[in-house]
Amino acid sequence: MEIDVIIPLYKPGKELFTLLDKLDSQSVPVHEVILLNTGEKYFEQLIYGTRFLEKYQNIKVYHVSKREFDHGGTRRMGVKKSSADIFVMMTQDAMPADDNLIEQLTEPLRDQVAVSYARQLPREDCAPVECYTRDFNYPAQSRIKSAEDLKTLGIKTFFCSNVCAAYRREIYEELGGFVKHTIFNEDMIYAAKAVEAGYAIAYAADARVIHSHNYTNVQQFQRNFDLGVSQAEHPEVFTAYPSESEGKRMVKDVTAYLRKNHMSGKLLHFYIQCACKYAGYLLGKNYRRLPGKWVLAFTSNKEYWKQNRKDV
């Protein structure tokens, strides 16, 4: 059984070499690493003088322009470049925590499980609120989620992250793969399709990657604007199971956490951050009512709109 890893890139730094070295030392070997690079000149600058292709002989590099990149479509392209039975989607800023990542991530892929996703651990520089959010979304206990969990988990049933997730090709092809065009959320849209088809989603807590961000309020606003857009464009997934209740639960949990750990001074910043996220989300869900200039100002992915909306 072959396992490939597919990684979209944009202006990668030297951390890419560390990531590739860690993938090369996994307990279960990776057959090929497929790099989907946006912006060829940045990649060429990175590897200049490194003998990159000599050192990493199992790597294939494909270049796309910034305008061509799409969260769903580019990943679909990567899957087509692979012939492996199982493929792992990763992002360039996700670092394997140990040599067992691929083994632990692919272990649940049996029976009705269509996709498994890894636990995300915070980086050393991670802010306290973001650290707690990692634990909220990626707890220490593994879980299999299916249609039977919709009544209790709601939208969380479909939660899956292409920061690090493994897919069974046979089921992927059966379901039609990732959505061709989306600004965000291609992983959850696929997971929802899998659950609705009778398959399950595995959260593999023992498969761990280091991945976190300390986003500014503006960045949070923009990311959540794009999140809202993705939900508005896919009502078949998100209308029946809105995410607002899950957001409210996280606010309550983080508030309790900060108070319990004598960090009440961080509450104001946290609430402002939440307001920025929620405002972005609401505007994104209603993007069709907004002027094109507003959409371009609010989004973190301007190229998406240049591809998909004539009035922007």
Would you name each region that the model predicts?
Residues 147-167, 183, 231:
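A recurrent flexible, glycine/aromatic-enriched loop bordering the glycosyltransferase active site
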Residues 23-63:
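Acidic donor-binding segment of Leloir-type glycosyltransferases
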Residues 183-190:
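Acidic donor-binding loop at a coil-to-helix junction in glycosyltransferase catalytic cores
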Residues 12-25:
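Short, well-formed alpha-helical segments that are part of the catalytic scaffolds
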